[in-house]
Amino acid sequence: MAPPAKRARRGLVPPGYKYLGPGNSLDQGEPTNPSDAAAKEHDEAYAAYLRSGKNPYLYFSPADQRFIDQTKDAKDWGGKIGHYFFRAKKAIAPVLTDTPDHPSTSRPTKPTKRSKPPPHIFINLAKKKKAGAGQVKRDNLAPMSDGAVQPDGGQPAVRNERATGSGNGSGGGGGGGSGGVGISTGTFNNQTEFKFLENGWVEITANSSRLVHLNMPESENYRRVVVNNMDKTAVNGNMALDDIHAQIVTPWSLVDANAWGVWFNPGDWQLIVNTMSELHLVSFEQEIFNVVLKTVSESATQPPTKVYNNDLTASLMVALDSNNTMPFTPAAMRSETLGFYPWKPTIPTPWRYYFQWDRTLIPSHTGTSGTPTNIYHGTDPDDVQFYTIENSVPVHLLRTGDEFATGTFFFDCKPCRLTHTWQTNRALGLPPFLNSLPQSEGATNFGDIGVQQDKRRGVTQMGNTNYITEATIMRPAEVGYSAPYYSFEASTQGPFKTPIAAGRGGAQTYENQAADGDPRYAFGRQHGQKTTTTGETPERFTYIAHQDTGRYPEGDWIQNINFNLPVTNDNVLLPTDPIGGKTGINYTNIFNTYGPLTALNNVPPVYPNGQIWDKEFDTDLKPRLHVNAPFVCQNNCPGQLFVKVAPNLTNEYDPDASANMSRIVTYSDFWWKGKLVFKAKLRASHTWNPIQQMSINVDNQFNYVPSNIGGMKIVYEKSQLAPRKLY
């Protein structure tokens, strides 16, 4: 007889939990709630400390702080008790030092040695005080701030000894930061790690690194700029060319990594969409390191030559808007995120935001004289909102060798499906019983219900007939909805195209035609266009959503008749029929059946150019989804990261002389690194038949490898090829 299976140690765990309490083992299965999940992560971190020779029970550790942060909004009693227990421990226990900021839950974290510094560094280090020298040694041995938890106050971490006021900055003429000139302060990592967990879950850690080039701003001033292109829109029929708006142009730049192509290469994405059924967005962190600042001067010779010098006293200004004070400006909508190629330097986009500007546009038509009427109302004083980073967000000053880390942001988003649905209203529920089945193969041999339509049993909402058919049977809800198709609406700031949920809407499949609100992307060489392309014309593609919205815009129609009477022309409205005698305006332009019975899928992730997450609207009635990103952050989203080369003035600067400062031409190169963590569910096969998966043909294969002069491109990939039932 086999010995009984050894049971996992339960420890002192209260009822309803598996990990919240001391003495339990780490193999109790899936946590029961978010507090229990935080306790499991806390236990795994403690195990990592113990393996590295540290005793976390006697000290307050970063793992304790992380548990406090994760349970600060806990609704369950166990999470609340654990939260206040570790807050009490924080108040009385000494801090655990010389440990990783965030021990890995998958393997022990070991300090990593940096490259040996040049000899002159030791001369500078020898002059330091004993305490300062010890701190430098710890900084040189400590790993990067991967996994550092962003504190409640949202303050990032800056590794810069000058900020301590101890006079322990590294040598090098007043610059050099904590690492010093010649000492690397970080690692370059673009690997995607897949960690397979219990019950079909996978933890996906996407690492991304880029060399970022930043020039000093054209001006140090904020500017309010109005764009007026009435020369384009003054002609009848050119309303779609309207660009009139107002914006604030700032001296800052935005480091935006909110696009799928920043994080995953084409091979990674193929693996994800072929094997996973859904994605959960977990956490995000980023940092700046190995900052380099240089000045540019020109010689007086003819022709002049440029001279580049390291400036160890110049500064890079960095600001993290962790509280989302600034206007939210995702750069993916303009294809201005960080580049998609890890080996190619990239640039941050100049940061700007919209400013209130009212106007009225009355379009003209052939029956009127003159041009379209534009009435400018300007800015309403009641609506003025002018934001500046300098007095709204803490600004950190980095010099050569310094580094900056944001800490970890944890998302609160609904999951994103990697499967599509095909069922429309006609495929919901129990099909009719067939009295007659085909007796031979062939497409012309059909089944037959065999019962007269008015003799069948079932439920309809047709009050004037007893017919029960596939057209009249009552379904539980409405799959999809008819939406305004290619429609423009008016707002107080000008016309806009009505956003609609994308989905497979009919027979149109050409990439230059959006079948039913399918997004069309235009992008340049940093974001997928062939890298050896010449000229300014961007490359484009239309993402044809694979899922079915339940609607057929090209063949749609509306019928409103007495059901038991013959159909007349006046009782049916076709897509080509005009409304109110207006030629070309029909019900598909204005008809909307969205309502409380509507069932709708989320938008698909669009690789590589699509946006990943979006900010929730600050309105009382929230939209159920956003058409530009599958993940909508509840309450808050990751803070935007702004950078700017600080003014490097000359002795000729006179604040009263002109609007432009007398500045030394200065630019910065720095390394950016981020980590984006997902949890994914492995897709289980429940059908007998195999399914289509993301693949490429022989011709497309060579898009992903360079040519003899380095030319290559990224082709968009489908993300929801596997079908699923919705009912």
Curated annotation (Swiss-Prot):
<keyword id="KW-0946">Virion</keyword>
<comment type="subunit">
    <text>Interacts with host TFRC.</text>
</comment>
<keyword id="KW-0167">Capsid protein</keyword>
<keyword id="KW-1173">Viral penetration via permeabilization of host membrane</keyword>
<keyword id="KW-1234">Viral attachment to host entry receptor</keyword>
<comment type="function">
    <text>Capsid protein self-assembles to form an icosahedral capsid with a T=1 symmetry, about 22 nm in diameter, and consisting of 60 copies of two size variants of the capsid proteins, VP1 and VP2, which differ by the presence of an N-terminal extension in the minor protein VP1. The capsid encapsulates the genomic ssDNA. Capsid proteins are responsible for the attachment to host cell receptor TFRC. This attachment induces virion internalization predominantly through clathrin-endocytosis.</text>
</comment>
<keyword id="KW-1176">Cytoplasmic inwards viral transport</keyword>
<dbReference type="InterPro" id="IPR036952">
    <property type="entry name" value="VP1/VP2"/>
</dbReference>
<feature type="compositionally biased region" description="Gly residues">
    <location>
        <begin position="166"/>
        <end position="183"/>
    </location>
</feature>
<dbReference type="GO" id="GO:0039615">
    <property type="term" value="C:T=1 icosahedral viral capsid"/>
</dbReference>
<keyword id="KW-1161">Viral attachment to host cell</keyword>
<keyword id="KW-1164">Virus endocytosis by host</keyword>
<protein>
    <recommendedName>
        <fullName>Capsid protein VP1</fullName>
    </recommendedName>
</protein>
<dbReference type="GO" id="GO:0042025">
    <property type="term" value="C:host cell nucleus"/>
</dbReference>
<dbReference type="Pfam" id="PF00740">
    <property type="entry name" value="Parvo_coat"/>
</dbReference>
<dbReference type="GO" id="GO:0075521">
    <property type="term" value="P:microtubule-dependent intracellular transport of viral material towards nucleus"/>
</dbReference>
<dbReference type="InterPro" id="IPR013607">
    <property type="entry name" value="Phospholipase_A2-like"/>
</dbReference>
<dbReference type="InterPro" id="IPR001403">
    <property type="entry name" value="Parvovirus_coat"/>
</dbReference>
<feature type="compositionally biased region" description="Basic residues">
    <location>
        <begin position="1"/>
        <end position="10"/>
    </location>
</feature>
<dbReference type="GO" id="GO:0005198">
    <property type="term" value="F:structural molecule activity"/>
</dbReference>
<feature type="region of interest" description="Disordered">
    <location>
        <begin position="95"/>
        <end position="120"/>
    </location>
</feature>
<dbReference type="GO" id="GO:0043657">
    <property type="term" value="C:host cell"/>
</dbReference>
<keyword id="KW-0945">Host-virus interaction</keyword>
<dbReference type="GO" id="GO:0046872">
    <property type="term" value="F:metal ion binding"/>
</dbReference>
<comment type="similarity">
    <text>Belongs to the parvoviridae capsid protein family.</text>
</comment>
<dbReference type="GO" id="GO:0098671">
    <property type="term" value="P:adhesion receptor-mediated virion attachment to host cell"/>
</dbReference>
<feature type="region of interest" description="Disordered">
    <location>
        <begin position="1"/>
        <end position="39"/>
    </location>
</feature>
<keyword id="KW-1177">Microtubular inwards viral transport</keyword>
<dbReference type="GO" id="GO:0140267">
    <property type="term" value="P:symbiont entry into host cell via permeabilization of host membrane"/>
</dbReference>
<keyword id="KW-0460">Magnesium</keyword>
<keyword id="KW-1160">Virus entry into host cell</keyword>
<feature type="region of interest" description="Phospholipase A2-like">
    <location>
        <begin position="19"/>
        <end position="64"/>
    </location>
</feature>
<keyword id="KW-1165">Clathrin-mediated endocytosis of virus by host</keyword>
<keyword id="KW-1163">Viral penetration into host nucleus</keyword>
<feature type="disulfide bond">
    <location>
        <begin position="633"/>
        <end position="637"/>
    </location>
</feature>
<feature type="binding site">
    <location>
        <position position="323"/>
    </location>
    <ligand>
        <name>Mg(2+)</name>
    </ligand>
</feature>
<dbReference type="GO" id="GO:0098670">
    <property type="term" value="P:entry receptor-mediated virion attachment to host cell"/>
</dbReference>
<keyword id="KW-1048">Host nucleus</keyword>
<keyword id="KW-1140">T=1 icosahedral capsid protein</keyword>
<keyword id="KW-1233">Viral attachment to host adhesion receptor</keyword>
<dbReference type="GO" id="GO:0075732">
    <property type="term" value="P:viral penetration into host nucleus"/>
</dbReference>
<feature type="compositionally biased region" description="Polar residues">
    <location>
        <begin position="25"/>
        <end position="35"/>
    </location>
</feature>
